[in-house]
Design a protein with these regions (language model features):
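Conserved catalytic or regulatory cores that recognize and/or transform ribose-phosphate-containing ligands
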Residues: 2-150
Length: 150
């Protein structure tokens, strides 16, 4: 009976599982407090608008975890737990955020860029076509890769 109760409980959780609307992707390393104030501010603004948000700065301690472990957790969240990716200001210059954007694209997720108001009190979500983005970190040359094209 105990086994059946646990099984039914897991099945109920599976049926009622709701994905996050957005995963927040943006620069963290080499920022004071790992850029947590920006991540927190944007996640708060989006939650007020009724969105469900996966904010990586709220999951685990980035100060005590390796880059590889952080990326494993974050990419898993993008693949499994989120419908779209919201790219924060400065994401283009972040290796981690570029990987997150690429994985989101490879998995067919939609993307938006977060544009902050001048005073930082509000943000706008601008649709962003990841298929038009050229992959960085190849010196002078960039490469274009679209896994969804034949």
């Amino acid at each position: 009976m105990k086994y059946l109760t646990r099984l039914l409980s897991k099945f109920w959780l599976f049926l009622n599982y709701e994905k996050n609307d957005f995963y927040l992707g943006g620069p963290m390393r080499n920022y004071p407090d790992l850029n947590a104030p920006l991540f927190s501010s944007v996640s708060h603004m989006l939650r007020i608008k009724g969105f469900k948000v996966w904010n990586p700065s709220e999951h685990g301690s980035y100060l005590d975890t390796s880059f590889a472990k952080c990326m494993t957790d974050d990419l898993t969240a993008i693949i499994r737990d989120c419908r779209k990716i919201a790219l924060l200001p400065g994401w283009q210059k972040s290796l981690g955020a570029n990987m997150e954007a690429f994985v989101a694209f490879a998995c067919g997720k939609e993307a938006v860029e977060v544009v902050m108001s001048e005073n930082g009190a509000s943000c706008e979500l601008i649709p962003f076509d990841l298929s038009k983005y050229l992959l960085p970190y190849d010196g002078v040359n960039t490469s274009k890769f679209n896994p969804h094209e034949e």
